[in-house]
């Protein structure tokens, strides 16, 4: 059965992502590829700082939950085929067919071509493609985590998944330092969006813990404590789950 609250979390987070990237082009930090500040006092930067720590993490949590729901009805082979055709193939083709154009404009705006006049054309094309990677990094990581998930399922035989159904509010609160620690691991040095540690943790927590209805029910009862404790995905999951907020959306 399709879970409406998961769809609501997803589309609202996507809206935040779009807003974030629109405002990011005018951030006051002066990051390469952006246009730059519009005014002396950049009030809109507050929105960037407010949502950046958690909104992509939340999407990976939801993706992990969705993976579990899919695997409840399909085999691992069907899951891998679906994820490969829907994630890996489009992200690879799109990177070199379309997104090099975005990379070109990013590098043009940031003045990168001025220092790369001696770079061979084929190498420059690859650099432009990865500079314009845009949202493709998300689905690339999602495919990697999906493949790892199948390996985990083969070894664990759902024993860990069944154990995680017992997670109560104190256990959920203890996930805060887990997420913080994961954020320090497996971060790529150049293309910084590839943060395997924190996003992988979010994906597997979504699969193992937050896909349980029993856990979400406990989370609903303790949502105020969660909100006061930290801004981790479980808080937002609870907030989005409240019937008074989302019913009928």
Model-predicted regions and their roles:
Residues 90-95, 207-217, 233:
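Juxtamembrane membrane-interface segments at transmembrane alpha-helix termini
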Residues 4, 8-11, 196-199, 225:
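Alpha-helical transmembrane segments of integral membrane proteins
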